């Protein structure tokens, strides 16, 4: 609707919109000023992510909440590879299924230099993915890396401790 042309924040938590819902948001000519998009628990899959990463509706996005959806390593890789989120400060993918492949895609992406908060809890990420994220040079502003509820072990703890004690 043209009445939404100045809309900056959308919160559609728990509406089970599915791929058609995100498709509508991605393709709307009236949502080009979005700064916050909260789509928790909406059964969003990689099909939606594929549309999202080519849409110019998200270039002003600062907060993207896609937690508790159906995003796999392929969807995470698509998100990591797009340069259409230059202002993104918060990315929440908690409780998806991105695994180590998705974590590695984010760790090697140069597209999130402004990111401050990254939530990847409950994503089946192991030490391999977690250590790579912790040691990544591509998150210069990161303040929070949430890896809760993943099967992590000593290697992750040691990597985090090593990074936190550099220069001391």
Regions from the PLM with identified roles:
Residues 92-123, 132:
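Ampipathic, surface-exposed secondary-structure segments
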Residues 2-9, 29-36, 56-63, 83-90, ...:
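Leucine-rich repeat
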Residues 2, 6, 77, 81, ...:
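Intrinsic disorder/low-complexity segments
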